[in-house]
């Protein structure tokens, strides 16, 4: 299990800062895919009408986890940067610190 604090002091390369400042940490989440991107328009056009599925559907999934991406926002100048972590099954943001001899809980 990976537990990351909600704030973190790290280097900010914004135009005003260019020094180590406090950053607010959130987990990156992919945005909703646009219906009007060229690939989606082409795919929808190809799919319409008779003839079933026109492109291969991917089935051979190999990975069981995704890499965690942190989004760091500078408290001073609001500049955002992204930081990727290693793969993990359980990710927690701002959870309790672990005590000695305590049992693991999910």
UniProtKB/Swiss-Prot annotation:
Pfam families: Ribosomal_L44 (PF00935). One of its GO terms (molecular function) is structural constituent of ribosome. Keywords: Ribonucleoprotein, Ribosomal protein. Residues 37-56 are annotated as: Disordered. SUPFAM superfamilies: Zn-binding ribosomal proteins. GO terms for cellular component: ribonucleoprotein complex; ribosome. GO terms for biological process: translation. Belongs to the eukaryotic ribosomal protein eL42 family. This is Large ribosomal subunit protein eL42. It comes from Pichia kudriavzevii (Yeast).
